[in-house]
Amino acid sequence: MSLSLWQQCLARLQDELPATEFSMWIRPLQAELSDNTLALYAPNRFVLDWVRDKYLNNINGLLTSFCGADAPQLRFEVGTKPVTQTPQAAVTSNVAAPAQVAQTQPQRAAPSTRSGWDNVPAPAEPTYRSNVNVKHTFDNFVEGKSNQLARAAARQVADNPGGAYNPLFLYGGTGLGKTHLLHAVGNGIMARKPNAKVVYMHSERFVQDMVKALQNNAIEEFKRYYRSVDALLIDDIQFFANKERSQEEFFHTFNALLEGNQQIILTSDRYPKEINGVEDRLKSRFGWGLTVAIEPPELETRVAILMKKADENDILLPGEVAFFIAKRLRSNVRELEGALNRVIANANFTGRAITIDFVREALRDLLALQEKLVTIDNIQKTVAEYYKIKVADLLSKRRSRSVARPRQMAMALAKELTNHSLPEIGDAFGGRDHTTVLHACRKIEQLREESHDIKEDFSNLIRTLSS
């Protein structure tokens, strides 16, 4: 038995798991095989616990399928694989990158639990403006299925900056928590290393600083400032679009930071390759580390957000009221918090108790607008236009995938975005049974986990219908 056994496991896991999960949890592992024991080394305790909880059965099953009764025992450790005398024994889960990336990516040290972070040079002379908001932490970020991977990735970066997930690219619609996670990472890094030079900014600030440096003949100072930070957190990178000089400077800054194992975190409202007006070489680099989507919060998360926000304001919010608001306002966290602030303000001004009837009155115009915007008819038209088919196709008996999948998507959206029952949704789709609607909803939920394209389609349609 040889260490190629772990490589076989990696190949199978890469085929079986979504790309994001494999990159986030399996790729950072290192392996050592001795005395019929396979030791897997995780970069930190968080990764170790997650892999053991979520993937232990998968890995043991693969070991048994490859080795039968001779399958090695599995052991988990935090840290890096001990150095051995035989170089070829060093086996990690670093699956080969595409050829074009290998040709263009700058050379840098292999990630480890230290990641070169403790060897960062002493602070240079610039005065750093952190701009990190201390109020945004991981503790007050409400986690749900829609943002679980993004939060986990951000947590790992905060614990191990400059490591396997560099750069970290978070994308999703407005008001979903991307900025909160940026600040949470910054706070996490500085809690671990108080003297760390962590800089948060909107992409437009980078552009403004560069323009000012050019005007003042201070471009070298500009370069020194941005290339000597320990972590650079840039929000809304899509605003670099069509700014060629800024993109050129950021390209070189990006390379310099990566070569120094300095952490980069970027956010955008769309997937990197879909950002128009940004050079391909930059978009390619955005995907070198880990790219994670944040989706609109599902119902349970929306309720949790409202309850937590109310608790922070020392407001008693009945569960049924939180559910009522969450069921009707679905687009993003910012909208939810704004609606709750409005309810709280009205309650304070009038001295009335917060009930469903009170909320219905306080949010009357907002709820009316939502109900007007999101109807089954509107969903059908939007989905048909998105997939370039006819509304009549969605209502027909046709079962070809080109029609069936959009129909399932439309049904799932109707369940998510309206208050109609399953039988009512079925009636609106050509008189179908409620079990057909339920199957469609479950199918789309499954495909969102397995298919990046379906996940993107769902997010894009939610964004369109909720805007």
Curated annotation (Swiss-Prot):
The keyword rRNA-binding does not apply. GO terms for biological process: DNA replication initiation; regulation of DNA replication. Residues 91-130 are annotated as: Domain II. One of its GO terms (cellular component) is cytoplasm. Residues 1-90 are annotated as: Domain I, interacts with DnaA modulators. SMART domains: AAA, Bac_DnaA_C. Residues 348-467 are annotated as: Domain IV, binds dsDNA. It holds the Pfam family DnaA_N. Residues 98-119 are annotated as: Disordered. Residues 98-111 have a biased composition (Low complexity). SUPFAM superfamilies: P-loop containing nucleoside triphosphate hydrolases, TrpR-like. It is found in: Cytoplasm. ATP binds at residues 175, 177-179. InterPro entries: AAA+_ATPase, Chromosome_initiator_DnaA, Chromosome_initiator_DnaA-like, Chromosome_initiator_DnaA_CS, DnaA_C, DnaA_dom, DnaA_N_dom, DnaA_N_sf. Keywords: ATP-binding, Cytoplasm, DNA replication, DNA-binding, Lipid-binding, Nucleotide-binding. GO terms for molecular function: ATP binding; ATP hydrolysis activity; DNA replication origin binding; lipid binding. Residues 131-347 are annotated as: Domain III, AAA+ region. It comes from the Bacteria. HAMAP family: DnaA_bact. Plays an essential role in the initiation and regulation of chromosomal replication. ATP-DnaA binds to the origin of replication (oriC) to initiate formation of the DNA replication initiation complex once per cell cycle. Binds the DnaA box (a 9 base pair repeat at the origin) and separates the double-stranded (ds)DNA. Forms a right-handed helical filament on oriC DNA; dsDNA binds to the exterior of the filament while single-stranded (ss)DNA is stabiized in the filament's interior. Domain I is involved in oligomerization and binding regulators, domain II is flexibile and of varying length in different bacteria, domain III forms the AAA+ region, while domain IV binds dsDNA. Belongs to the DnaA family. Oligomerizes as a right-handed, spiral filament on DNA at oriC. This is Chromosomal replication initiator protein DnaA. The gene is dnaA.
